[in-house]
């Protein structure tokens, strides 16, 4: 009997911070964080022609301002989710949003293409820290609540709204202000979401967690990164080019 019990896996409990927070404010803050992450990926598209004139760069080169964010975000999404389970989702959200607000403000001061692309890569890293922690936090905050499905539905709907809202807000801003105004707006939204999460979102993490698989994480980042890069470069080289085929094959092998 003793040996049989030892074979039964014990569930991994969740450790919560003493602060319970307000569910409504917490949901609003988490949805605002998701809105920021998704919107920042689409708000830049409408600013590319204006950036081209201001930075004296071609539209093709400036496309990497959009793609750099997508690439770093997609490559680090899975490792960031695993890290939030170990380190704490609230802590991950605070670090990600603080970084997002600061880097977005720094991006507004860019005067060269390489600066803009580099900072967009960093913004993608911050977005990867934020996005998975929002959903997992909502699931825990609304655990046992009849509104849990509604909260998750609002989270998903916010992602869709962010995709559509980005070009609209970007167009309005560019109608009256310079191209860097889109980054100032994102910085302000990030700061507001940061303050709300600091007040309303409790800390949650697992008591026990599996050992962090560093080699597997590196391979995951490399594989997803290569796959996303191949898809991004498909319009430039074509599906049958050796660059795209090689990138996809390397991603599948990894």
Predicted segments, located by residue:
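Transmembrane-helix bundle of Major Facilitator Superfamily
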Residues: 2-199
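Hydrophobic transmembrane-helix bundles of small-molecule transporters
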Residues: 153, 175-254
């Amino acid at each position: 009997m003793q040996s049989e019990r030892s074979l039964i896996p014990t569930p991994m409990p969740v450790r919560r911070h003493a602060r319970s927070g307000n569910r409504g404010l917490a949901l609003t803050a988490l949805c605002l964080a998701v809105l920021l992450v998704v919107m920042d990926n689409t708000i830049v598209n409408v600013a590319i022609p204006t950036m081209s004139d201001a930075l004296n760069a071609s539209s093709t080169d400036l496309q990497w301002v959009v793609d750099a964010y997508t690439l770093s975000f997609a490559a680090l999404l899975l490792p960031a989710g695993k890290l939030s389970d170990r380190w704490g989702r609230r802590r991950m959200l605070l670090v990600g949003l603080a970084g997002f607000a600061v880097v977005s403000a720094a991006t507004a001061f860019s005067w060269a293409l390489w600066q803009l692309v580099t900072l967009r890569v960093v913004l993608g890293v911050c977005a990867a820290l934020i996005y998975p922690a929002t959903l997992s936090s909502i699931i825990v905050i609304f655990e046992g609540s009849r509104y849990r499905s509604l909260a998750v539905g609002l989270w998903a709907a916010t992602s869709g709204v962010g995709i559509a809202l980005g070009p609209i807000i970007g167009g309005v801003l560019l109608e009256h202000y310079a191209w860097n105004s889109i980054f100032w707006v994102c910085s302000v939204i990030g700061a507001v979401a940061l303050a709300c999460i600091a007040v309303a979102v409790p800390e949650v993490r697992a008591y026990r967690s599996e050992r962090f698989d560093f080699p597997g994480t590196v391979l995951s980042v490399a594989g997803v990164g290569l796959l996303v890069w191949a898809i991004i470069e498909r319009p430039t080289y074509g599906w049958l080019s050796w660059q795209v085929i090689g990138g996809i094959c390397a991603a599948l092998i990894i």
